[in-house]
């Protein structure tokens, strides 16, 4: 987009047979007035009207970037996106199916249950059960052979506890609570800083996916 925000990443992988595969990483809403990833685009992307979805600035930007990158019609593409980025990914898989071979869509915290993603595309959706955004479509994700939904649960942050002095004189510090807007704002997660992030934050979705992987899901 030429901006410090609203930026996507396109990576090309050359396979052993000389053909290419591609990975497109799409950001979420940044709310900037001149960004293609503004608030209004979310409404357009979730429309039941295909033409309206295709006209969303964020979807058009990603489609144009893919064209300029030289992605061929028959070259496999994986799309990964958080929040609005996931809705864009679902829109591209649904509405650009004739232009590209979208093999895999990965969404994190994205309301995409109503998108008509074709059966040829594998979908992995990561959702956190206490946060609102992924539920804005008002529907559960399809239960099909090509659609996997990973649902994470964020435990509340620990309450304050006193320090413990042991018989040998050593001391175990107690937990110091970090307060936020909800009990989940301060729940510890790998990569967090001050613990004030909402559970829509991408780190929660990454942690949920990693936990599911560790459990053998």
Where are these regions (language model features)?
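Flexible, membrane-associating and regulatory peripheral segments of lipid-active enzymes
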Residues: 1-23
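Gly/Ala-rich beta-loop-alpha elbow adjacent to hydrolase catalytic centers
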Residues: 80-90
